Amino acid sequence: MITNLCFHGVGVCAREREDGEAHYWVRESHFLRMLDEIALHPEVRLSFDDGNISDAAAALPALQDRGLTATFFALAGRLDDPASLRPADLRLLRSAGMPIGSHGWSHIPWRGMSDEVAARELVEARSALSEASAGPVDEAALPLGRYDRALVHRLKRCDYAAVYTSDRFPARAGSWFQARYSVTADDTRESIRARLSRRPGLEDARGLLKSALKRVR
């Protein structure tokens, strides 16, 4: 089993795009200490959602210093936003060996989308990110972590190689469905160490059950 950890922003959230976004940003000093711990755990996989510019400015050099890699799930609708990853930033990440994934176009929930909106979020966004990053975009991360059976079928029809959620339980390496633990402003190196060192328990079982129910509803 592996543990997927998801970051959203490093440093200070200057402007919240959604209520509560700042809670998912981590102080840079804490981030560096977390990476020091993560580097000791080869079973950990890292990813970054939302495509904030801190991915390239702060996260990339810290990852490189520790020989770590991560997948960066960017937003196609923010490629011209100075606070977000632009095409040059995506190409920089890719040239450093970091895979680029899709987080959609507008950071909206993907459940219950019309066919028109789904085409933009699942197909057009992927194409735009592939062009912007000059390479393939094979994986997707669900905005806000919401999904149901219909969305799972849509994503499979789009032939994504893997889909990442915000469900909190360990995942199987190579599985199409990848659950993740989101890192928040409350986390520290010590909390990350505790997460990675403990055995799967009741919380993980609850997460697995909730995920199974969402996939059949």
Predicted regions span which residues?
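C-terminal active-site subregion of NodB/CE4 polysaccharide deacetylases
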Residues: 1-47, 52-56, 112-139, 145-217
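Short, small-residue-enriched loops and turns at beta-alpha junctions
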Residues: 78-81, 108-112
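Acidic (Asp/Glu)-rich catalytic clusters
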Residues: 36-39, 60-68, 85-101, 156
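Histidine-centered catalytic micro-motifs
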Residues: 5, 9-10, 99-107
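A short alpha/beta connector and helix-capping loop motif
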Residues: 54-77
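Charged helix-capping and loop-helix junction motifs
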Residues: 83-91, 115-122
